[in-house]
Amino acid sequence: MSTGFFGDIAKIKYEGPESTNPLAFRHYNPDDVVLGKRMEDHLRFAVAYWHTFVWPGGDPFGGQTFERPWFKDSMEAAKLKADVAFEFFQLLGVPYYCFHDADVRPEGRNFAENTSNLNAIVDYFAGKQGETGVKLLWGTANLFSNRRFMAGAATNPDPDVFAFAAATVKTCIDATQRLDGENYVLWGGREGYETLLNTDLKRELDQLGRFLNLVVEYKHRIGFKGTILIEPKPQEPTKHQYDYDVATVYGFLKRYGLENEVKVNIEQGHAILAGHSFEHELALANALGIFGSIDMNRNDYQSGWDTDQFPNNVPEMALAYYHVLAGGGFKTGGTNFDAKLRRQSIDPEDLLIGHIGGMDCCARGLKAAAKMIEDKALSAPLEARYAGWNVPEAKKMLDGGFSLEEIEAWVLKSDVNPQPKSGRQELLENVVNRYV
């Protein structure tokens, strides 16, 4: 039954590249087969509950611009928001959604009320999932918005806050399992510091390590089959966050014995804030064996903060999905649109148009990436670039067959005198441009 929020808009359909209908897909056809798999199954699109249905359209210089009938802190409003959300998922035809606990339930007076409210809305969500077939990609806890978390959650100097946060995560994992969620995400929005003058770095890192171990231990104790994910971000809201980027997260996981238990959820905008490209973070996660999922969006390259816009750069998406596919594709992860409307985009249909454009952009990127893989457009030159490592002496240097002295003897005996070879960067850039 329609809520009426989206008026008479019908389910969004694929109309092909020639269509000029803003409420139609031009490139995303869920049933298109790409590399032997349906496009929908490759991309595994999800809608972010927080930006789509919770964000009021404010900025540091002005307040709410969006008028939504569910912008009230009550269970009745939470259920209306859920009705609109699941109607939206069906209009778009997305298979998944994601949420924080605070996105979906009214705020209670204490932990017990928060838990009761969350359980009530989870029951409601379970019914909506059964009616629509839409599934939960991942759940998470908001451990950054409430003032109790102003000095962090797991890294807070107050053990009561640590306990409150741990208990909250426990209830959110329970909710995720109840809804058959395929992952559980931890984003340390305030797990960092504003100044070192009042920060004990070692203590806070040890607290964070113990917190994450508690999560993993609980996952195994209750038999949760999903993947635990950390979402890296370098700063904002804190000056310096402990989950700065993929490399930092991997070092943290190794230190606390969690590198085989936890993977990463990589956001495009966070990669840019960290001074990296999106594809760098994806390629590194693959190389380290911790790639899990992505939050898809776009940052304004001039602003210097997290703008969370919808993706519209096809060449960038092509390289991103190239690395997703090269790593074997998503297992339990997917493409979550962690993107929000601009504050002047106040019409209900703007929510659909933003997601349609993002989904089309990702579809174009996926198809270009798949074609590059089929043609070995990048893998063949890469293999040729490193071909020298296939000779016996080169293999011995890496597998322990040569000591440093033996390498020296080989260099002298064979008169090894390496000559530079072109990296052919311009050629490879031109190759990529042929596909996008």
Curated annotation (Swiss-Prot):
Q: Where in the cell is it found?
A: Cytoplasm
Family annotation (SUPFAM superfamilies):
Xylose isomerase-like (SSF51658)
The entry's Mg(2+) 2-binding residues are 267, 270, 306, 308
Query: What are the record's GO terms for cellular component?
Result: cytoplasm
| Keyword terms, alphabetized | Carbohydrate metabolism, Cytoplasm, Isomerase, Magnesium, Metal-binding, Xylose metabolism
EC numbers listed for it are 5.3.1.5
The record ties this protein, via Gene3D superfamilies, to:
Divalent-metal-dependent TIM barrel enzymes
The cofactors required by this protein are:
Mg(2+)
EC top class, as a word: isomerase
Active site per database record: 100, 103
HAMAP family (UniProt xref): Xylose_isom_A (MF_00455)
Q: How does this chain assemble?
A: Homotetramer.
Query: What is this protein identified as?
Result: Xylose isomerase
What organism does the UniProt record list as the source? Rhizobium meliloti (strain 1021)
Gene symbol of the encoding locus: xylA
